[in-house]
Curated annotation (Swiss-Prot):
Tissue: Expressed in shoot apical meristem, root apical meristem, leaf primordia and the marginal meristem.
Family statement drawn from the similarity comment of this UniProt entry: Belongs to the DNA polymerase type-A family.
Alphabetical list of SUPFAM superfamilies matching this protein: DNA/RNA polymerases (SSF56672), Ribonuclease H-like (SSF53098)
GO cellular component, one term: chloroplast
Enzyme class: transferase
Identification of the protein by name: DNA polymerase I A, chloroplastic
Length: 1033
């Protein structure tokens, strides 16, 4: 049994009444909703004013019989079930009228979740939003027009019965007077043959107004009222926003320009036009794809094309496919594979020029269907990057961002309102509705296949606009690039669109080809190293917990990945840098998983437990803070606390200490440690000596946890996933020209971010292997950026050092430090050593061994100078004063005055022209510096030095890849490019021709500019071949 809360009686308002005794009312009182079987079941109804009734017109006589009021649709010949159904309806009406009465006669609106109006809450509720705002007028006797939301009222009073069979509903309150009776009237409607209504309905309590849902109600028991919270059935999504409505109206205007192709016959006629009459046009193409997560999955082997659009045009205008239709929209969602295949002659024709936005994605999903796409003419994303490489932070390179930007589309200004791309989120996104009926912040979008089926016309307009916008964007960017001069080696070479045609168009096609090839991954090996990594991670975490638990007992249960728990151990009591007076507490409780199964006797084992952590050290030096003002516990901070502890020492328990099974320590004789330089700031903070060493080793173990977690989550686990690979087990990462310098970036997965070889502790590169019968060639440039810097600056010292060969960084150290030079000249050390037969070691130490500190500084300076680093940055790297770092810089520049002069020239040029150029003539733009502050100017000056060096290195790598791709002999041997990672390329081909192929690759990379080298220095290339990437390094 479910019982509703009592409802307040509504004040009666007299309406016109009918007191006739005939079961059939006069025509002027007929209900517009009377039954169709009128003759056999004449309706009992009465009219009223066209608004609402404050009273439901339902009550109980002194004998307990129901009296029907104004809205009864029954007569004495009606069946019991009809009375039951009508009773329900009257109850809903009574509830609704009570709601309306509260709104009309009360002083405040009704609030969500409250049907009972309490005048004492009028003031308190003044800030609540109104539930009902207006009344709608309609036909008399219409329930719909007696409240704003019937369903809402229903759900506020209806309670589901536990029984399968619906039961009668009864509202009992002797104070309720029917509208067709004056006060004191005893008229009531009798049953047929003088049977009262009471005899056919269950007994109900008259003591209080109750909603009862049950088969029967006991006569002799007082009913206990039960309240149950009922959530109204609000819609899942909010209504469209004004922005969305306006966007939809504008979008719908292009529908008349779209030709819908959804059958084979119309597809054939369209393809005939595309391949004959309009073959010489530029064709902008775009696809819409279902069943793919574009952020996580590769399009190679994933996704399903549900539709595509083609918009064609030339310098004279757009193509006309009949009746002014300028765009084709092709439906291939439900059984449209045959329609798609009809377009194979169009997609596969290399002489039909096709432009795309994000070409690599569209071509992969089309080729998943068995069509080999050819005729690549342009990718508007690449054109936009070539025109302005700095848009990543100023509008971006999305189709929406580009086509709605006046600066981009001003070449086709008149078409901007028609061609500006509108996002799917704007058109189809709706905010979710919370349980209380208010709008949430989360915007959701229905699956694209559902949108195409259920909102077809709008979806056709949305998806067709992609190709329309792409065509206009191509025209605008082409005009801009044709208006921009291409300067190569200080000489005019044509326009930047000529540069695109010569370099970036074939490079874009090559990158897509490399993505399609992919690289084979040994998942069994990855699974093995994952187990090893997890084991070592747990060992390191346990070591830290055991050490910390000596100072704070509950630390053995702590979560080592929790920043707050780590901060609690090391930085309790520290004041927030942003909020003066607010400090991190000295102790704090945390909830952690109850892995030990600790439970109170007689109770269930809880999933979590509470631990208390307190600060275990005081006065730790703090150099870094989070944006919220608390001390940072990042990897860099923890490494500065730990120092440089060798990895093999980390997995030992502690220097001079062992632990027994219960975690207590077994003291061993303390060892003498002469050199404390490897230890970090924690050594002194924990008192030095044995305790300081233990602290540094434990914190180093914590750093190790973070490092292993990064390898597991960033490389080992993702490389085993199906989302980035296809059925053959090859990984297909996305290669993009989307960096400001022109360097490639990679995602899903980011193979550009592989750990450095010396830090690749699990040898992850061993997992990248050649297919059976094949071999990998790995070729890498040596010190490419430094050689580029020597060429651009024409630095005599650097050119001579590269010409002499050997260890460039050792030569730099020799030129910087006089005592190192003296040692070389006196033959106390050697710059480099080439062993002869029978020689095991050099006759005297090598410079890199005897003067390791000086060489490390020289090496860091070599790369830092190329990246535009200043004395301030170097002082942070070396942990020295700015003055000392500046003095070291002067030593470097002493023999390299040409570099200093070139850097000053680049800074001035960038501030004046707001751009700098790479070796091949690509530009890197900067914002106007007229009103820029010192910080922004400093950033531009560093970028003005870095961009030409890194950008030129990217030019060299690109030309080398194109040279390899053009080589006919490599194609004949069956070798193909797979990856480019920074200055390194990876190829795969037959094992039997590996040696010959390696020689050709080295030649191509050494002379990347159409078989020549235009630089003033040689390009050193190191190449090997093996079965795995790691083995070939």
């Amino acid at each position: 049994m479910a019982v509703a809360p009592p409802l307040p009686p509504a004040p009666a308002r007299q309406l016109r009444r009918w007191k006739g005794s005939s079961p059939r009312p006069p025509p002027w009182l007929s209900s517009p909703f009377r039954r169709t079987r009128y003759l056999s079941r004449p309706a009992f109804a009465a009219g009223g004013r066209q608004d609402y009734s404050p009273s439901s017109g339902m009550g109980v006589s002194k004998t307990g019989a129901f009296r029907l009021g104004l809205y009864g649709n029954l007569n004495v010949q009606s069946s019991v079930q009809e009375w039951v159904d009508e009773t329900k309806r009257l109850f809903f009406l009574r509830t609704t009228n009570s709601v309306r009465n509260n709104i009309t006669n009360g002083t405040t609106p009704l609030r969500v979740g409250n049907l009972r109006h309490d005048p004492s809450e009028d003031i308190r509720s003044s800030n609540y939003p109104s539930l009902y705002n207006q009344r709608e007028r309609g036909p008399s006797n219409s329930i719909v027009n007696r409240h704003v939301d019937t369903d809402l009222a229903k759900h506020r009073v209806m309670y589901q019965s536990a029984h399968a069979v619906p039961a009668p509903f009864s509202v009992v309150n002797n104070d309720i007077k029917p509208l067709n009776m004056l006060d004191g009237s005893k008229e009531e409607i009798p049953w047929h043959d003088s049977v009262t209504m009471e005899s056919s309905l269950p007994k109900v309590s008259k003591s209080e107004k109750t909603l009862v849902v049950d088969k029967a109600i006991p006569d002799k028991k007082e009913h206990k009222r039960i309240t149950r919270k009922v959530t109204p059935n609000f819609p899942d999504k909010a209504s469209l926003s004004t922005e969305s409505k306006n966007a939809r109206k504008l979008l719908a205007t292009i529908y008349d320009k779209v030709l819908v192709v959804d059958n084979v016959e119309s597809a054939r006629s369209v393809v005939k036009l595309l391949t004959t009459k309009y073959k010489g046009f530029i064709h902008a193409c775009d696809t819409e794809v279902a069943n793919i997560d574009v952020k996580e999955e590769t399009p190679v082997g994933h996704g399903e094309v549900i539709c595509f659009s083609i918009c064609s045009g030339n310098s004279d205008g757009e193509a006309d496919f009949g009746n002014g239709k300028t765009c084709i929209w092709v439906d291939v969602l439900d059984g449209g594979r045959d329609v798609l295949m009809e377009f194979a002659p169009f997609f596969e024709d290399p002489f039909i020029k096709k432009v795309w936005h994000n070409y690599s994605f569209d071509i992969h999903v089309i080729e998943n269907c068995g069509i080999k796409v050819a005729g690549f003419h342009a990718d508007t994303m690449h054109l936009a990057r070539l025109w302005d490489s700095s848009r990543r932070t100023d509008g971006g390179y999305s189709l929406e961002g580009l086509t709605n930007d006046y600066r981009v589309m001003d070449a086709v200004l008149k078409d901007i309102p028609k061609t500006g791309k509108v996002s799917m989120k704007t058109i189809f996104g709706r905010k979710k509705v919370r349980k209380d009926g208010s709008e949430g912040k989360t915007i959701s979008i229905e699956p694209v296949e559902k949108l195409q089926r259920e909102d077809r016309e709008l979806w056709i307009c949305y998806s067709s606009l992609d190709s329309m916008s792409t065509l206009k964007l191509y025209e605008s960017l082409k005009n801009k690039l044709e208006a921009k001069e291409w300067i190569f080696d200080d000489c005019p070479r044509g326009t930047m669109y000529d540069f695109y045609e010569e370099y970036w168009r074939p490079f874009g096609a090559l990158l897509v080809k490399m993505e399609t090839e992919g690289v084979l991954v040994d998942r069994a090996y990855l699974s093995e190293i994952e187990k090893a990594a997890v084991t070592e991670r747990e060992l390191a975490a346990d070591k830290f917990r055991k050490w910390a638990s000596k100072h704070c007992p509950d630390a053995k249960y702590m979560n080592v990945n929790s920043d707050n728990q780590i901060r609690q151990l090391f930085f309790g009591g520290i004041e927030n840098r942003n909020k003066r007076g607010e400090t991190w507490p000295q102790s704090k409780t945390f909830k952690v998983p109850n892995d030990e199964g600790i439970a109170t006797e007689g109770k269930k084992t809880p999933k979590s437990r509470t631990i208390k952590l307190f600060t275990i050290v005081e006065d730790l030096k703090i150099d870094m803070f989070t944006p919220t003002g608390w001390p940072s516990v990042s990897g860099d901070v923890l490494r500065s606390l730990a120092g440089k502890i060798p990895t093999d020492h980390i997995y030992k328990i502690d220097d001079g200490q062992e632990f027994d099974e219960d975690g207590s320590s077994l003291e061993l004789p303390e060892q003498d440690i002469e050199d404390t330089s490897p230890y970090g700031t924690a050594y002194e903070a924990f008192g030095g000596g044995k305790k300081g060493r233990e602290a540094c080793h434990a914190i180093a173990a914590l750093c190790e946890v973070f490092s292993i977690d990064k390898l597991i989550s960033g490389f080992i686990v993702p490389l085993q996933g199906d989302r980035i690979s296809c059925k053959e087990g090859r990984i297909h990462c996305s290669l993009n020209i989307n960096t400001e310098t022109g360097r490639l970036s990679a995602r899903t997965p980011n193979l550009q971010n592989q750990p450095a070889l010396e830090k690749d502790r699990y040898k992850i590169r061993h997992a990248f292997v050649a297919a059976p019968g094949n071999t990998l060639i790995v070729a890498d440039y040596g010190q490419l950026e430094l050689r580029i810097l020597a060429h651009l600056t024409n630095c005599k010292s650097m050119l001579e050092a590269f010409k002499a060969g050997g260890d460039f960084h050792s030569r730099t150290a020799m030129n910087m430090y006089q005592h190192v030079r003296d040692a070389v000249e006196e033959k106390k050390v050697l710059l480099e050593w080439h062993p002869q037969p029978g020689q095991d070691k050099p006759p005297v130490p090598l410079l890199k061994d005897a003067f390791g500190a000086e060489r490390r500084k020289a090496k860091m300076l070599n790369f830092s100078i190329a990246y535009g680093k200043t004395a301030v940055g170097l002082s942070w790297d070396w942990k020295v004063s700015v003055r000392e770092a500046r003095d070291t810089l002067k030593l470097w520049y002493r023999d390299r005055k040409e570099v200093s002069a070139w850097q000053k020239k680049q800074k001035a040029f960038a501030l004046e022209k707001c751009e700098v150029y790479t070796l091949l003539g690509r530009s890197r733009q900067f914002p106007n510096m007229t009103h820029a502050g010192p910080g922004q100017k400093g950033h531009v000056e560093r970028a003005a030095i870095n961009a030409p060096v890194q950008g030129s290195a990217a030019d060299v790598a690109m030309c080398a890849m194109l040279e390899i791709e053009r080589n006919a002999r490599l194609k004949e041997l069956g070798w193909r490019l797979l990856l480019q990672v920074h200055d390194e390329v990876i190829l795969e081909g037959p094992t039997e021709s590996a040696e010959e192929a390696k020689t050709i690759v080295v030649e191509c990379m050494s002379k990347p500019f159409y078989g020549t080298n235009i630089l003033k220095v040689d390009l050193a290339v190191d190449a090997k071949y093996a079965k795995s990437w790691y083995a070939a390094k």
